[in-house]
Amino acid sequence: DQICIGYHANNSKKQIDTIMEKNVTVTHAQDILEKKHNGKLCSLKGVKPLILKDCSVAGLVLGNPMCDDFLNAPEWSYIVEKNNPINGLCYPGDFNDYEELKHLVSSTNLFEKIRIIPRNSWTNHDASSGVSSACPHLGRSSFFRNVVWLIKKNNVYPTIKRTYNNTNVEDLLILWGIHHPNDAAEQAKLYQNLNAYVSVTSTLNQRSIPKIATRPKVNGQSGRMEFFWTILRPNDTISFESTGNFIAPEYAYKIVKKGDSAIMRSELEYGNCDTKCQTPLVAINSSMPFHNVHPLTIGECPKYVKSDKLVLATGMRNVPQKKKRGLFGAIAGFIEGGWQGMVDGWYGYHHINGQGSGYAADKKSTQKAIDGITNKVNSIIDKMNTQFEAVGREFNNLERRIENLNKNLEDGFIDVWTYNAELLVLMENERTLDLHDSNVKNLYDKVRLQLRDNAKEWGNGCFEFYHKCDNECMESVRNGTYNYPKYSEESKLKRKEIDGIKWESMGTYQILSIYSTVASSLALAIMVAGLSFWMCSNGSLQCRICI
């Protein structure tokens, strides 16, 4: 009768890497690197993105006439801006601290537009003629919706003095501007005053003077406009004073809801889908801790790494035995590979006795290993799968060195994460395979310590009993209740019987060996004597006897 200790094997082709080996085939493995995506821009946790189409953030906040679709934008999860939107500053010019403004917008989920200085309140100035063919709407000249371009009235431009107090509980985003004419004639035509200025006082003090200069035409305009913005806190006051060239605020934005928004560069349209993680190119819905789809993300995202493969071993080495061995399908132990016939556990036994043969998994050690490995995998995923965002940052032309430094830092972080992820997987895979080897060895030692000299170790993971071991006996070995004294006498007799056969065989071999040696020597002596007699008789050999 025989019992073997072994482990599960299957038809799996999954391969993992360890510190010491590459492409190790295992019975079970779990991929922790997400490579799949849906190729769409999606809502983020049920909230749609604000896709600006051909508009820029500047066109959105100033109210470019071509961006009327976004005049009252609902709450958004993130903003999508094309790489080169055509509807931004329709009247050529510049937006002061534009990158900071985009950063502010990217951390906001909802604006509410309110009127702070009504257009019809400018009774001493022309508030309707300030339009341009550069900002058309329905084929007619128009202007930005949220500001008013004030012109002289009746050849007079009285000094403007306006104050606004923020009585709201929210912060206010306020925008204004200054016009830089092409020449003095245009300055006089529009504002009458040649030495004009625009002064703004709030938490900052700013005084701007028109820069009159000849410039090339852009969008049909030789003049330029410069726009500014500020955040007005609750109960704070902003004051405007101007003698010309003033582009006054009509509307401001209450920052109703701040949050984890972002501005993404993408040419995609809305894909009518929902996701937890969005990149500029695709959406990712995954519970894996790592991904290699795109480095820029928003939402609850896996961490981006440059790896192509991150697979955690959860099972053991998959080395199925080539074929059954011996009579009645005898099978070897774990030294010679795993068992595909054992399907209800990772480790277990195969026995052969007078009642038949069969497999039995050791469910206790299997469950303990499963629990340990499952907890380890879940722990890795939980620790790595925290909310992680990596959004692009905006820099102006004077900040290219900072932008390059920032890019190098981000690339360095990605390299570190990639190295850490790959090293983590290699180390954990090594530990997992060692754990399985240790569990099989522990099972083997458990049997060996019970059987002691009641069975013979074959050295391949199997034991041959010196006594009869029925199914009840086999079960006692498996569950650790084997009664060694009960079978020791029978085993002792069996060992003596085997030893006696050995000694008897050894004695027979010695007698045969002696007989063979004597017979060979006698035959050789007779042959030598006969040869000598023949040679003496024909004179070939002379024999002398001396006394």
Curated annotation (Swiss-Prot):
Keywords: Clathrin- and caveolin-independent endocytosis of virus by host, Clathrin-mediated endocytosis of virus by host, Disulfide bond, Fusion of virus membrane with host endosomal membrane, Fusion of virus membrane with host membrane, Glycoprotein, Hemagglutinin, Host cell membrane, Host membrane, Host-virus interaction, Lipoprotein, Membrane, Palmitate, Transmembrane, Transmembrane helix, Viral attachment to host cell, Viral envelope protein, Viral penetration into host cytoplasm, Virion, Virus endocytosis by host, Virus entry into host cell. Glycans are attached at residues 10, 23, 165, 235, 285, 479. Residues 532-547 are cytoplasmic. The keyword Transmembrane applies. It comes from the Viruses. A lipid is attached at residues 536, 543, 546 (S-palmitoyl cysteine). GO terms for molecular function: host cell surface receptor binding. Residues 1-510 are extracellular. InterPro entries: Capsid_hemagglutn (IPR008980), Hemagglutn_HA1_a/b_dom_sf (IPR013828), Hemagglutn_influenz_A (IPR000149), Hemagglutn_influenz_A/B (IPR001364). Disulfide bonds join 4-462, 42-273, 55-67, 90-135, 277-301, 469-473. The chain crosses the membrane at residues 511-531. It is a single-pass type I membrane protein. The record marks 325-326 as: Cleavage. Its main location: virion. It is found in: Virion membrane; Host apical cell membrane. The keyword Membrane applies. One of its GO terms (biological process) is fusion of virus membrane with host plasma membrane. Palmitoylated. GO terms for cellular component: host cell plasma membrane; membrane; viral envelope; virion membrane. Homotrimer of disulfide-linked HA1-HA2. Belongs to the influenza viruses hemagglutinin family. Binds to sialic acid-containing receptors on the cell surface, bringing about the attachment of the virus particle to the cell. This attachment induces virion internalization either through clathrin-dependent endocytosis or through clathrin- and caveolin-independent pathway. Plays a major role in the determination of host range restriction and virulence. Class I viral fusion protein. Responsible for penetration of the virus into the cell cytoplasm by mediating the fusion of the membrane of the endocytosed virus particle with the endosomal membrane. Major glycoprotein, comprises over 80% of the envelope proteins present in virus particle. The extent of infection into host organism is determined by HA. Influenza viruses bud from the apical surface of polarized epithelial cells (e.g. bronchial epithelial cells) into lumen of lungs and are therefore usually pneumotropic. The reason is that HA is cleaved by tryptase clara which is restricted to lungs. However, HAs of H5 and H7 pantropic avian viruses subtypes can be cleaved by furin and subtilisin-type enzymes, allowing the virus to grow in other organs than lungs. This is Hemagglutinin. The gene is HA.
